[in-house]
């Protein structure tokens, strides 16, 4: 695992965010393919997406009539998601938020695309996953892979939003610490692996 030690407070980075995921055609196509695959393979009843942005991914589940919730800390972007019919809470994901949410409903699928590297407290993040996820559920996370970043010279993925750069060997003990395990690993061409 690699990490940046000079941290910018998350509220400064994400309080009023300017990146809208739906502006990237390649990312939207990737999200659509992933959503279809998750629906086919996992058949979820309730999907929670962490850092759901403008609802680009959850809108597929909404269109299929699948219960969903987006968690997006940037109010300006969360408002766009809500305006398009995506139920969205404007907060940073944490174990505390997960405990609040689980009192209403647990998730059998949690999606976290390009957010885990942003979390300054990975233990709190993973603890939140464990709390919110049903015992037979799945958490799917996409993030830049440190091995690809170094091996392919992808240093353009290094910036203040990304606090951590993970390897599989750094993730396994982190997940185990919270009684979770990695069951599948895939490399994708999106965002550095």
Residue ranges and their predicted role:
Residues 1-80:
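Extended interfacial segments that mediate partner engagement and assembly in macromolecular machines
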Residues 139-164, 168-170:
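Short, glycine-/aromatic-enriched active-site segment of Class I SAM-dependent methyltransferases
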């Amino acid at each position: 695992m690699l990490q940046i030690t000079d941290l910018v407070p998350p509220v400064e980075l994400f309080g009023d965010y300017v990146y809208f995921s739906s502006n990237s055609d390649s990312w939207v196509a990737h999200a659509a393919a992933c959503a279809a695959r998750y629906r086919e393979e996992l058949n979820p009843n309730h999907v929670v997406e962490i850092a759901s942005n403008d609802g680009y991914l959850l809108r597929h589940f909404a269109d299929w009539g699948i219960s969903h919730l987006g968690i997006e800390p940037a109010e300006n972007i969360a408002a766009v998601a809500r305006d398009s019919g995506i139920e969205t809470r404007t907060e940073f994901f944490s174990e505390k938020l997960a405990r609040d949410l689980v009192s209403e409903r647990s998730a059998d699928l949690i999606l976290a695309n390009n957010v885990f590297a942003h979390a300054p407290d990975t233990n709190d993040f993973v603890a939140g996953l464990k709390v919110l996820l049903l015992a037979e559920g799945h958490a799917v996370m996409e993030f830049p892979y440190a091995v690809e970043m170094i091996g392919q010279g992808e240093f353009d993925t290094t910036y203040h939003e990304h606090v951590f750069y993970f390897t599989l060997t750094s993730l396994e003990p982190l997940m185990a610490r919270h009684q979770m395990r990695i069951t599948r690993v895939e490399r994708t061409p999106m965002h550095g692996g």
